[in-house]
Amino acid sequence: MKVDDGLEEPAGSETWAAKPAELVGAAASDVDIDPVIHAQARLRIMATLAAVPVGDELHFPRLRELLDMTAGNLSTHLSKLEGAGYVQQNKTYAGRSPATYLALTPEGRVAFERYVRNLRSLLDA
């Protein structure tokens, strides 16, 4: 039998589709998933910046290229992350041209690690 998500129902399980919600239901109320990070674009930004070694920064155009996002969309999500204290933007000049470099703040790194840990515990429930 096929369910809406395209997965096969295991043999002998007539209530398979309801089981994930039952298993996760109790655990989900105990797990805090940060809504600032959880949005897809911001999660991709955080994951990319988390891969940058502490003390290093990523140039805005490189992040935009890696994530295949428009400059406006990336800027909007970076502003939200910066407002939460998760990302810092270092605006400077390279010659006469403005340049923006990005990095996770220490709080942002901790928040991302907590997010990953909480998501894993939710998925493992």
Predicted features along the sequence, with ranges:
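Amphipathic alpha-helical dimerization/coiled-coil segments
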Residues: 1-30, 47-50, 110-125
